[in-house]
Swiss-Prot record:
Gene3D superfamilies in the record: Geminin coiled-coil domain
Subcellular location(s) per record: Nucleus
Species of origin: Homo sapiens (Human)
Protein name as catalogued: Geminin coiled-coil domain-containing protein 1
Post-translational modification as stated in the protein's UniProt record: Highly phosphorylated by CDK2; stimulates initiation of DNA replication.
Family: Belongs to the GEMC1 family.
Keyword entries, A-Z: Cell cycle, Coiled coil, DNA replication, Nucleus, Phosphoprotein
Record GO terms (molecular function): chromatin binding
Keyword Lipid biosynthesis recorded: no
Function: Regulator of DNA replication. Promotes initiation of chromosomal DNA replication by mediating TOPBP1- and CDK2-dependent recruitment of CDC45L onto replication origins.
Chief place of localization: nucleus
Length: 334
């Protein structure tokens, strides 16, 4: 069977030139093609034509995809650069840690040499001797016993300190030591003088002058009881005399006033001599809880003197130029 194979057939090559491996002209004697050979060759030509047609379509679909090739390369380069930078940081950290480790090893070697030195061994021997001694054990035992005791057990009830009252008690002890013993003053004396105590004036109450206001005749009759003696102004006590708490009595001075002059003698003493303070007297029928006699006289425009007479003595209260009060107590002397 003689056959001519058309190599330019478009069914085999898709419309393109195709180099046929066989010659275009054959003879029966040179080529013998069976039916099976013809079918296999025809199927191979069909497959080659399909592959050539699918290749341009694949290139077009790849070019039309959502990830273009230049953008993909730039993203990969950015990821690679970040990884390289991270790797460089880790390498620097590793170098620093290695240097620090080497320094620690060196310090450790120096410490070992110091511990193996003779000085440290000598100190260890001394410490062992001290710990093994009996004195240290006794002292440590006392310290442990003292530490177990509470603060309440360390002090007795009388020895427990009171920081709040310590200063107050100390000041009271000093005050008791500084005070001098003296006879007490009756409360009615202080009330009559208008004083709270010997050093404080009571501004709320005034001196008791009820005896002078309610019994003028009694005062006048007292002057008339002594007609023979005269008043000695030179011997009258002065305001600057010191206070004497002795309980002695003295004989009173007497006045030359008569019963007919009545109470006018007090009005005549408006401007007495400077040394005049009081006119003492004594009556047995006057109660000791009341003022026997008291009067006020002005020695100067800015100085007032008030005098009070009692069985125990005489009291003088004077206001000075600064506005304060001065108190003087003169007991009776025998």
């Amino acid at each position: 069977m003689n056959t001519i194979l058309p190599c330019q057939d478009q069914y085999f090559v898709g419309g393109q030139s195709y180099n046929c491996p066989y010659s275009t002209t054959t003879s029966e004697s040179s080529v013998d093609v069976s039916t099976e050979t013809w079918v296999s060759f025809w199927a191979a030509g069909l497959l080659d034509n399909r592959e050539l047609q699918q290749a341009p379509q694949a290139q077009e679909s790849f070019s039309d995809s959502n990830f273009p090739l230049p953008d993909l390369c730039s993203w990969e380069e950015a990821q690679l650069s970040s990884q390289l930078y991270r790797n460089k940081q880790l390498q620097d950290t590793l170098v620093q840690k290695e240097e620090e480790l080497a320094r620690l090893h060196e310090e450790n070697n120096h410490l070992r040499q110091y511990l193996n030195s003779a000085l440290v061994k000598c100190l260890e021997e001394k410490a062992k001797k001290l710990l093994s001694s009996d004195e240290f054990s006794k002292a440590y035992g006392k310290f442990r016993k003292g530490k177990r005791k509470s603060k309440e057990q360390r002090y007795s009830p009388a020895e427990i300190p009171h920081p709040k009252n310590a200063k107050r008690n100390l000041s009271s002890e000093f005050a008791n030591c500084e005070e001098q013993a003296g006879p007490p003053v009756d409360p009615w004396v202080l009330q009559t003088l208008g004083l709270k105590d010997l050093d404080t004036i009571d501004d709320t109450s005034s001196a008791n002058y009820s005896a002078l206001a309610s019994h003028p005749r009694r005062v006048a009759s007292t002057f008339s009881q002594f007609p023979d003696d005269a008043v000695d102004y030179k011997n009258i006590p002065r305001e600057d005399m010191p206070i004497d708490y002795r309980g002695d009595r003295t004989t009173p001075l007497h006045s030359t006033a008569t019963h007919g002059e009545d109470f006018h003698i007090l009005s005549q003493l408006s401007n007495p001599p400077v040394g005049l303070k009081t006119l003492p007297y004594y009556t047995a029928h006057v109660s000791p809880n009341k003022t026997e006699m008291a009067f006020s006289t002005s020695l100067s425009p800015h100085c007032n003197v008030k005098t009070h007479s009692f069985h125990q003595g005489q009291a003088f209260v004077r206001r000075d130029e600064e506005g304060g009060w001065k108190f003087t107590w003169v007991p009776k002397q025998s």
